[in-house]
Design a protein with these regions (language model features):
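RNA pseudouridine synthases
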Residues: 1-198
Length: 198
């Protein structure tokens, strides 16, 4: 876990691949417990899939919990992800397909192609469980390493190529626009560079 932003009210940390956001059934290591060990009043406001990596925002002052919970509920927290998907020919588009019977919308931007894959930026407008992975698979561009939704073509990569790279929100105390960014982790850099050609 690496801290990307911290003040008296909130903390934003990088969740590594393979670590659950909160305790799984039966217990075990998880991000929430690690954060609570340092900030005992921390509140988990959203989650990332265990097999994804990237930024997670916590309230560490209970007085801002309600404001941040409402910001997530009303989609006022802007999340940006970077991913690598199987296939080429993807441009700038919007995936607007229900997920588990609920409206779900994801904005997609192609950043480069190579080796039969495409590097993309994803901006979810809703926050359904596994939304980005399901949308990518339904569009015919499963995420590299997605063993649940990706099929055989996606399984040859050792991890899911999905990273929560940016959070933008209005700070609950200062009311200032706040942006926190996270670089790709080392285990995704090589794949990303092979697709982007750099």
């Amino acid at each position: 876990m690496r801290v990307r932003y911290e003040d008296e009210a909130i903390v934003v940390v990088d969740k590594p691949f393979g670590l659950p956001s909160q305790a799984p059934r039966g217990g075990g290591a998880n991000l929430f417990d690690q954060v609570r060990a340092i900030w005992p009043k921390a509140a988990l406001l959203h989650r990332l899939d265990t097999v994804a990596s990237g930024l997670v925002l916590f309230a560490i002052d209970p007085r801002v919990n309600a404001a941040l919970t409402e910001a997530f509920r009303s989609h006022a927290v802007h999340r940006t992800y970077r991913a690598v998907v199987v296939g080429t020919g993807l441009g700038a588009e919007v995936w607007d397909v229900e997920v588990q019977g609920k409206a779900a919308r994801t904005q997609v931007e192609s950043l480069g192609t190579g080796r039969g894959c495409t590097a993309v930026r994803l901006l979810p407008h809703t926050g359904r469980k596994h939304q980005l992975r399901i949308h990518a698979a339904m569009a015919g561009f499963p995420m590299c390493g997605d063993r649940r939704y990706g099929g055989e073509a996606a399984r040859r990569w050792p991890r899911l190529a999905l990273h929560a790279s940016r959070l933008g929100f209005v700070h609950p105390v200062s009311a200032e626009p706040t942006t926190v960014e996270s670089p790709l982790p080392d285990d995704l850099v090589e794949l990303w560079q092979s697709v982007m050609g750099s």
